[in-house]
Amino acid sequence: QRQMCIRDSVITGEAYGSAYVTMNSKALGADVTYAWPDASIGMMDANEAAKIMYADDIAKSADVQSVISEKAAEYAALQSGVESAAARGYVDTIINPEDTRKYVAAAFEMLYTKREDRPDKKHGTV
């Protein structure tokens, strides 16, 4: 059975955890994934991750908020920034918001003739 379905994604804001993974991520077979420069992609929000990972440092600090901000910035740069997501292959291209329509249209043109060969049945016993 031959099927055609273009799977194109644009990440415009926060894409965290299993919610991101299940909503047409590269891991589930998206053909093209774009992200805006201010998007955040990862397992969790950088502030929340910093609170968990650096709880001891935060507890010892007199200025809790500055330590959280500092550690969150480090975490975001290494784990949840759009550049790190692109380096890991989760995002194909980082695009400016004003260019979104152009890139999505180009992806549709590129994938217009896409065909997938799939088995007739999803489950062989049914």
Model segments located where?
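Ligand-binding clefts of soluble mixed alpha/beta catalytic domains
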Residues: 1-3, 7-126
